[in-house]
């Protein structure tokens, strides 16, 4: 699925890219983002080039962690609901803290992606 994402491409450089999001599974929601934000703490430290991954500080000689899909916080409307995701309906407003696109947290997930799975 084609999505758009906020990408940190280098220290202090941000761009907007088209990316490939994974196909939604039965436990997933597809969300059209309306608001997303970059935190001054965690995400700011990645953008400034101070972190390598998760809570690991960058040190001279480490590979740069760029490019990376940033984020872990977003608000949007549900576009589609997986068969094993009870309690949600298309059109619901939701807050989500992650999506299934690899990003700032190694094998965890990123957030500034729309539509987001």
Residue ranges and their predicted role:
Residues 99-115:
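A structural motif shared across PLP-dependent enzymes of the aminotransferase-like
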Residues 10-12, 25:
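Residue-level recognition of beta-strand termini and adjacent short loop/turns
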Residues 16-18, 75-77, 93, 107, ...:
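Conserved hydrophobic/aromatic beta-strand scaffold that supports enzyme active sites
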Residues 2-4:
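Extreme N-terminal starter segment of soluble prokaryotic enzymes
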Residues 22-38, 46-101:
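Glycine-rich beta-strand-centered segment in the early N-terminal region that forms part
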Residues 7-9, 48:
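Residue-level signal for short segments within beta-strands and strand-turn junctions
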